[in-house]
């Protein structure tokens, strides 16, 4: 646990969800240590799960090489292959938004005890990059593999909640992060779906393993 408070030079920032943030961090402070440890580990390393799900989605989307008449197979594989790039675009949009909005972390402006150490000044809060990435990954999986999405969607919500629990984000930071992740990734996946049928041509090139199993 780390006690934090804002020096006078930071000003006095107030948001509508200050009370909710303080209540969550107080609950985290009073919770058993093992629970806080698990939430902290998920908050720090949980994005790796989304990377694994994206990889699994691409692997599952590739049709067998023998399925020569499955025209949609390479298209599905190509769509899954573009998914990580879509998530990266969502992250880039989030990073630009952070630099423009320049909202300070709640642990820098409120006197609270947090599970994680408060990020340094200049590490902006709005929107939550973790929430953006998780929501974008869940969205692209909804477009490519509903079974994996059934795991990714609740995992994205848990990722967003964990960022508030450990004290590094306001609730509105993660809420906006989820919205940004969906709004950026969904139209990009729609556009990618229109171009995906061109992937059939890759089956006749050395790039065939990208869209079909050997």
Protein language model regions, located:
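Hydrophobic alpha-helical transmembrane segments
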Residues: 42-62, 130-135, 142
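Membrane-interface helix-loop junction between the first two transmembrane segments
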Residues: 54-77
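Membrane-interface loops
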Residues: 70-144, 148, 156, 200
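N-terminal transmembrane-helix/juxtamembrane module of multi-pass inner/ER membrane proteins
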Residues: 1-51, 94-122, 199, 203-214
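Lipid-exposed faces of alpha-helical membrane segments in multi-pass integral membrane proteins
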Residues: 49-56, 85, 89, 93, ...
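Membrane-interfacial segments
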Residues: 59-67, 100-105, 191-203
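Hydrophobic, aromatic-rich alpha-helical transmembrane segments
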Residues: 34-37, 72, 76, 80, ...
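Membrane-embedded catalytic cores of phosphoryl/pyrophosphoryl-handling enzymes
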Residues: 117-214
């Amino acid at each position: 646990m780390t006690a934090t408070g804002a020096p006078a030079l930071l000003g006095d920032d107030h948001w509508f969800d200050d009370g909710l943030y303080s209540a969550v961090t107080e609950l985290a402070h009073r919770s058993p240590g093992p629970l806080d440890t698990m939430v902290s580990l998920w908050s720090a390393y949980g994005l790796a799960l989304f990377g694994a799900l994206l990889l699994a989605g691409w692997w599952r989307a590739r049709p067998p090489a023998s399925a020569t008449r499955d025209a949609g197979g390479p298209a599905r594989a190509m769509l899954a292959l573009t998914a990580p790039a879509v998530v990266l675009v969502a992250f880039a949009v989030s990073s630009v938004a952070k630099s423009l909005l320049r909202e300070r972390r709640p642990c820098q402006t409120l006197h609270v005890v947090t599970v994680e150490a408060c990020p340094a000044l200049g590490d902006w809060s709005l929107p939550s990059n973790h929430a953006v990435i998780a929501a974008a990954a869940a969205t692209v999986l909804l477009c490519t593999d509903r079974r994996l999405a059934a795991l990714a969607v609740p995992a994205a919500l848990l990722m967003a909640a964990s960022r508030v629990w450990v004290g590094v984000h306001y609730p509105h930071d993660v809420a906006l992060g989820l919205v940004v992740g969906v709004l950026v990734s969904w139209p990009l996946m729609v556009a990618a779906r229109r171009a995906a049928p061109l992937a059939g041509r890759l089956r006749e090139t050395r790039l065939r393993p990208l869209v079909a199993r050997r």
